[in-house]
Structure formats: structure tokens, C-alpha cells
From Swiss-Prot:
InterPro entries (UniProt xref): ATP_synth_OSCP/delta_N_sf, ATPase_OSCP/d_CS, ATPase_OSCP/dsu
GO CC, alphabetical: plasma membrane-derived thylakoid membrane; proton-transporting ATP synthase complex
Taxonomic path: Bacteria, Bacillati, Cyanobacteriota, Cyanophyceae, Synechococcales
Family according to the record: Belongs to the ATPase delta chain family.
Assigned keywords, A-Z: ATP synthesis, CF(1), Hydrogen ion transport, Ion transport, Membrane, Thylakoid, Transport
Gene: atpH
Subunit structure: F-type ATPases have 2 components, F(1) - the catalytic core - and F(0) - the membrane proton channel. F(1) has five subunits: alpha(3), beta(3), gamma(1), delta(1), epsilon(1). CF(0) has four main subunits: a(1), b(1), b'(1) and c(10-14). The alpha and beta chains form an alternating ring which encloses part of the gamma chain. F(1) is attached to F(0) by a central stalk formed by the gamma and epsilon chains, while a peripheral stalk is formed by the delta, b and b' chains.
PANTHER family noted in UniProt: ATP SYNTHASE DELTA CHAIN
Keyword match Transport: yes
Pfam families: OSCP
GO-annotated molecular function: proton-transporting ATP synthase activity, rotational mechanism
Location relative to the cell: Cellular thylakoid membrane
Job of this protein: F(1)F(0) ATP synthase produces ATP from ADP in the presence of a proton or sodium gradient. F-type ATPases consist of two structural domains, F(1) containing the extramembraneous catalytic core and F(0) containing the membrane proton channel, linked together by a central stalk and a peripheral stalk. During catalysis, ATP synthesis in the catalytic domain of F(1) is coupled via a rotary mechanism of the central stalk subunits to proton translocation.
Entry membrane topology: Peripheral membrane protein
Annotated protein name in UniProt: ATP synthase subunit delta
Amino acid sequence: MPLLNTITTPYAEAFLQVAESRKEVDQVVDQAKAVLALWNDCPELSGAMASPVLEVEAKKAALQKLFANQVTPSFLNLLKLLADRQRIGVLDAVLERLIELYREQRNIALATVTSAAELSEQQQAALQKKVQAVANTDKLEINLKIDPDLIGGFVVNVGSKVIDASVAGQVRRLGLALAKVS
């Protein structure tokens, strides 16, 4: 991953600086999240863009058609620049690094919450307050995931901290405790 960071960080940093100068940082970060979700959900798109068979001009035309009305002009320029430099295959890593730099700059902690079932808005708000207290931060971004294997409850990952309040985790800990006793 360090080699990939060596490639992606300059693009992410430069794009963040451009967005700051144009006062559109929050907007481009939201767009980056949307484009990243599309990129990850559509392997055909990412595969075609990474393909050496497809010519650069065709890639740029496709990017123009797909994203012209969806992203800022500076974001579209980043996409075309990555295509020009044969780096569009690492777009996901560039956008992830951009979002990471944005969070660092704004002191936003990232928490991944995996629950057994969908959480209501009320549960999410209560969980956000508790996780903010545990993470000791004013700003928190929560990434929600569903994993029915947890049976019930949830698991929270914030930085290096893990809070396992799942039924599966309790069963595992009970099994370990019983194994020690016998």
C-alpha cells in the first residue's frame, strides 16, 4: 500500500488544494463519496476504465458523459487527468486518500458500525453520541454496515478501538471462558 499512497497522495493533495481555492471542499468530498460508491458498485465501469485496450480519448469521453452533470468542473478535470496519465485505474485509491486527508484536516473521526440489522434514525443518533464520547471527538462520521452473522447487537471500530456488543461476540467470549474453566 505504501507504493499506492506514493502514487495517489499527490493527486489527492493537489485536488484538495484546488477545491479549497474554489471553496468547494465539502461539495467535492460528497461527490468523491458518490463516485467512489459507483466505482466500487460497478466493476464493469472500473474494469473498462482500467483497461489498456480502451484508448485514452474514449475513456475521457466516457467520463465526460457519465460525470459532466454530476461533479464540479475541477472534479471532472481530475478524472480526465487521471485518464491522460494512465492512472484512472487507481481512481478509488485517489478518492479514498482525498476523503482521508479531508477527515484529517477537519479532525473528523471515522467509525465503522456493523450491526445485525438496520438501525433506525433514533438508534443511529444515540449510537453517534456514545461513539463520539468513546472516541473523544466532536466530529464523527459513521460508516454503517449490516452483518446478519452478528445475530444481534453491533460492533464499533474507531481507530484502534473495537467495541463488540454483538450476540456473536458474547457467544465467542462465553466459549473462550468455558474453554479456560474446563
